[in-house]
Structures are given as structure tokens and as C-alpha cells.
């Protein structure tokens, strides 16, 4: 089906209009991994004062997780944990979490969403902030896992001499992780449209 819907206000939409939109959505959704990778590449050359640029940091974080035997979903969370830096200077973990939310486990999502607070353990005190801010989550089931993510992968990923895997290595993983949402208000409609 090709074409465009004809309404100028959604209240005037018809079944035919929404069939056109749904068909287009499926094709568009399949390109999500490519769009995410394009956005991730915006981090290249952006050092923000750090020893490596933000793309290198992301690749290093994911490479360390992969080489440590983490599963693909975890590795993609590691790759994308700072993708929000470009649009969410004050809440970058929330941006990454919003992208990942339909596709990853609640455990990995929480880790990505909270990593900024947990990472603060290493530097908040230099900025006049409370480095122990993560303690508010001490009773959360993902508390130790998020400490581990930051300590082993995120905080350690600023080494200019580390041999990171290339972005192309992670592309097939991206395709698999983003192939089908686990949770979304559109999940049932998307699945129905793909089988039609």
C-alpha cells in the first residue's frame, strides 16, 4: 500500500487512512537501528573535555561488556548508554532509556536509566555534589548490578589506548535487539500488521 492519509485532523481519519499509516510505520520501524546508529555517530569528535570522544567511550563500554561475556542486550545497552548526550545534556540517561525501553528487560532499562547517578560516585564530590547519591537505591534489586556496570564498563571506558571493537561489529546486535518490541502500546498492532 502506498500513498498518504487524507485527513487534516485525526478525528476525520478513516480505516483506509490508518491502513496507509500502519503500512508505512512497519517499514519505518525496521529502519530504527540504522537511525539510532546514525545518531550515535554524532558523538564522534565530541570530547566534552574527556580523554576520548563520546563515540569512543560508547564503543569502549560496549567492547568491554562484550569481552566480559555479557549478552547482546546488555552490550547494546552499554553501547547506547550515553547516546542522550547530544539532546539531553542534563538528563542523558533518560534519553537512552526512552530509546531502549520497548526492547530491553526492566533490569537493563533500570541500569541505563540510573547509571548517571551511580557514575556520580566517581566525580560528584569534585563538583560539590553528593557522591553517595546512589545510596538512595541501596535496596533496589539492580543496585549492585548498576554499580558493576559503572565500575567495570562505563567508568573504565576512557582509555585512548584501548582497542575497541568497531561500530560495524555491533550493527547485527542492534538489528536483533531492536527487531521487535517487548513492550509498547503499539506492540499488538505492529505484530498484526507484520503478519498481514
Language-model segments: residues:
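Metal-dependent phosphohydrolase cores
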Residues: 1-79, 83-196
